[in-house]
């Protein structure tokens, strides 16, 4: 497309490529591809509509938070540019505030997160918003601040599939299973586990799910350790080639999960690339926990 100077076709192909790179957690590559798209837009505004780029721009801004080498000042500048572009295309600031609410929750700045959630909810829903994703990320705030009952109540549209998105419903099941078990509600936890297992069927290669699997493993190590380790084997392999944020978050969740494994040793089939690899497949739980803590 570039050789034929077909800018419109090249842009469509690059937007599709960003979708594929997003599934692979290839943040740096995503950003590079989108930078080319923006350059083409600036030089060919008669061919490329800015409105067509904004959904993926939201993803790109999200990716900048995940790369430690990008200073926060630059992340904020990208956010301000995204904000300018959505406003001039007639969108509300709902998606802008939503992204900040997510990042503040991940940074455990819960007061700020709540402020952004309230600002988000005060803005109108539009085509830059995804109700299912908004609900899913809001759950993190309520679950992490100890408000399980409120989280479970708010999650009902996700649980009952009144609102859906490619992964939002599954992510809700995964974390609600863990938090319900922790809250002393094993029946709810078991229900969420069943729903999660159904949704995970056929997604054995979806490595981007790593960010959400750690707490599900923790749930299983509380209730069915063998099943938990089956998922851990898969996810540890994924963690060796994912981005920095996903590796960090998964490691944090595994430190939590391993508190519930009472055996001193476990038998695992892990890849040779794993730093603690053992040919006999026998791993010390304490050494595994130390490894994940150091990550």
Question: Where are these predicted regions, by residue range?
Answer:
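Mature, well-folded catalytic/scaffold domains that follow N-terminal targeting or propeptide regions
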Residues: 107, 121-131, 140, 147-152, ...
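Solenoid-like repeat scaffolds
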Residues: 1-7, 38-47, 80-91, 118-129, ...
């Amino acid at each position: 497309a570039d050789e034929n100077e077909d800018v419109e076709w090249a842009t469509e192909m690059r937007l599709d490529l960003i979708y594929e790179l997003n599934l692979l957690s290839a943040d740096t590559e995503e950003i590079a591809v989108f930078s080319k798209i923006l350059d083409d837009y600036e030089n060919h505004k008669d061919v490329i509509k800015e409105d067509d780029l904004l959904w993926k721009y939201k993803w790109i801004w999200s990716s900048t938070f995940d790369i430690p080498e990008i200073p926060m000042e630059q992340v904020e500048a990208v956010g301000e540019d995204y904000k300018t572009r959505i406003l001039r295309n007639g969108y509300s600031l709902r998606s802008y505030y939503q992204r900040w609410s997510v990042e503040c929750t991940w940074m455990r700045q819960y007061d700020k997160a709540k402020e952004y959630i309230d600002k988000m909810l005060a803005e109108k829903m539009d085509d830059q918003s995804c109700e299912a994703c908004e609900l899913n990320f809001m759950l993190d705030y309520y679950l992490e601040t100890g408000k399980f009952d409120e989280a479970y109540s708010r999650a009902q549209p996700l649980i009952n599939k009144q609102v859906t998105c490619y992964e939002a419903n599954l992510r809700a099941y995964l974390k609600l299973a863990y938090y319900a078990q922790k809250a002393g509600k094993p029946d709810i936890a078991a229900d969420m586990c069943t729903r999660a297992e159904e949704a995970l069927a056929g997604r054995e290669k979806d490595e981007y799910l790593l960010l959400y699997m750690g707490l599900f493993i923790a749930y299983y190590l509380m209730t069915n350790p063998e099943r938990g380790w089956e998922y851990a084997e898969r996810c540890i392999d994924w963690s060796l080639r994912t981005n920095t944020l996903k590796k960090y978050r998964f490691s944090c969740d595994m430190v939590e999960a391993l508190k519930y494994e009472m055996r001193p040793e476990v038998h695992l089939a892990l890849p040779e690339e794993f730093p603690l690899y053992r040919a006999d497949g026998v791993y010390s739980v304490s050494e595994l926990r130390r490894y994940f803590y150091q990550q």
